[in-house]
Amino acid sequence: MRKIILLLIPLLACLISCSEKKNSSYRKQDIAEDLNIIVIHVDDLGWTDVGAFGSDYYETPNIDKLANQGVKFTNSYAAAAICSPTRAAMLTGKHPARTGITDWIRARFQGGIIPEDGSNPQGYDENGDRPLKTPKNYLYMPLSEVTIAELLKERGYQTGHIGKWHLGPEEYFPENQGFDVNIGGCDLGQPPSYFDPYEPFNGNEEYIIPNLPSRKEGEYLTDREGDEAVKFIAENKESKFFLQWASYTVHTPLMAKDELVDKYDSLEKGKQDNAVYAAMVESLDDNVGKIMHALDSLGLTDNTLLIFTSDNGGLMGNPNSQVTNNSPLRSQKGYPYEGGIRVPTIMRWPGNIPAGKTSKSPIITMDILPTVLRYVDGSVDESKWDGKDLSTVISHPEKEFKRDLFWHFPHYRGRDVVPYSIIRSGDFKLIKYHDGSEGELYDLKNDLGENENLISENPELARELELKLEEWLIDTKAKMPVKK
């Protein structure tokens, strides 16, 4: 018996050692106290606007490399089909229906003047001859909202914002929402110009980026943002940092460097054919590469979670002046179809996130905050947010995790878009129109382009999804349009 025990001791030691080695690769995911976090939040980038997601016209070697080094999410969604709601959702982990920011926020030069009492607008817009009164949209994200930057500052992070903010005037800028550094973040939803000194052609002093001083006349804005990002990374290399680069590109005005426009003018065009837009995408890619190179040269790559995503679907423009093409998805930015809300998303953290994998699990903007906290703290209480911790999804990209996703837009947008709410449950997507128009039901697995409305053929399924949607609207206390 003694011999057996003596023989078993080395075996047990080996098993314990092997078990420790097996689990050690996951310990970094359990808690990573010195993890750096970079979120690249692109403006208006469509689902197929990069090579890794299907473009054969736009050249994006650095973003494609990022996808090869991490997990690519093909069922990734923006929280809204327009910018401000998605941006607030990313920062707070809360759905636009819950934050109350359900439309894009008007800047000062667009009439976004906050009342003397400092409150966000209440009540309804009458909308002329339209049948619904719609809730007034907020003019700022309240300072009472706790942002991912504030949460990470509490954990000892240096925090930086570069680029577009679009969540209210000066008193609501990034530096008042947890960011130590703010370069370019103001109330504007688009730049007055993409070339230094970034001044409007009409001379409107309210249509400027107040915290982006001129550096070199003629310098391209996306290049400037990339340089500022690298500078922030280098200055904080000895500490842990959170950087949000919310690029102004590829939002209008369409402006690009001449040499890149000439390059794309000379290339064979397909479904995507706008040379200026293509040049803007390439400049974006160049500066993603600039950040990746900086992380490599500073020895920070393996200790940095890098998230790449977009705030809504691509802007297609009109048939006579196409901006981009979102096919096989239907429609574009601002609309309730996949072309308005499905976006490219990539996550990379070498040694912790599988490389070169694709996940089909549905994810949404609000998931970023709880996922980051899960990696930083080792655990997260999801009940505090509308987003979900994606760490299991990321670790097992081959598995498809099911969940319900929701959207809410209680406003009119031009003459085409009426107030709507959406639920995606499994492969099915229901669009409910609040003006009484017939809803739409699509099987996304077999009809990604949303060509065949199945609602009349599946009334029971449609009603089941509608009841889920109505329950969610009540739970979030969503602002609703009302009949006149």
Annotate each language-model stretch with its function.
Residues 226-236, 262-304, 463, 471:
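A long, amphipathic alpha-helix that forms part
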Residues 181, 186, 314-338, 352-357, ...:
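C-terminal cap/loop subdomain of S1 sulfatases and analogous C-terminal strand-loop tails that border
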Residues 37, 43, 152, 164, ...:
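A short aromatic-rich beta-strand->coil structural motif
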Residues 174-178, 253-257, 293-352, 364:
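Histidine-centered active-site microenvironments of extracellular/periplasmic hydrolases
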Residues 25-71, 452-460:
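Active-site-proximal N-terminal segment of extracellular/periplasmic enzymes that hydrolyze or transfer
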Residues 56-88, 93-98, 158-160, 180-186:
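Short, structured active-site-proximal loop/turn typified by the sulfatase FGly-forming signature C/S-X-P-X-R
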Residues 106-158, 165-241, 247-256, 268-269, ...:
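Formylglycine-dependent
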Residues 33, 56-60, 77-82, 108, ...:
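A short beta-strand-to-alpha-helix junction
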